[in-house]
């Protein structure tokens, strides 16, 4: 993983050649990830200068060569519209240089919505190798209403929209290993939520004697309970919801599936994912 350190393009690295070797020995490829989660990062200025873009790219490719990685994944999120031209130019330059070293370039992107159309995904698709659509955060911490993190219709929309701009065999669908427990206080308009992993959600539902029912329209179990002052709801992510999402991904013949994030999953989910990968390969 790589992170921006300063405005000159210097990045910090957590890359490990030992980790890459372990992955390769297990028959896995490794794509080094660079993100923009540093609060000081601003693509409208950080990527506006050729010298800064060049410095970032040089470091990424040097690290990739040193560790023996197979590709680079760009996870720049919440981009401003004014910064998109600079972001696109960064991707063009990175992809050109990476391909010269036989490296794959993938980018992460939110589900296409009216308010993110300025991302110009069609233009990105002209040069990157893969696009990973993050089919989660349908409802998030700041949402005005409680709801699923990743309902089946939301995943279907993500797949349909992405395959309009990029061939299916270059699209990877990201699905969540997490959910949220939503609290709606009676008599109050504000709602709150807390992130839970798969086991955490199951345990919370059991401990609070929540009633769990399957919602076929959402492809999820929904757990609810009411107390004297509030309603608590969890749109569960479990083996059943994962399987419904994997069916969509498989049916669309996508390149693969990604997950966010490790440590939130139930152990049984991996057998489902492995079954999908083997069937789709």
Model-predicted regions and their roles:
Residues 46-65, 113-122, 237-250:
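Short, acidic/polar
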Residues 177-245, 277-281:
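Glycan-binding loop/region signatures in secreted carbohydrate-active enzymes
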Residues 1-5:
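Conserved small/polar residues in nucleotide/adenosyl-binding loops
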Residues 19-72, 76-77, 100:
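Substrate-binding cleft of extracellular glycoside hydrolase catalytic domains
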Residues 245-281:
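Acidic/aromatic/glycine-rich contiguous surface patches that form carbohydrate-binding/processing clefts
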Residues 13, 18, 25-27, 83-85, ...:
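Short acidic, glycine/proline-enriched helix-loop-strand junctions
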Residues 74, 131, 173, 249, ...:
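Conserved, mostly hydrophobic/aromatic
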Residues 7-14, 58, 81-205:
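Substrate-binding surface in catalytic domains of secreted glycosidases
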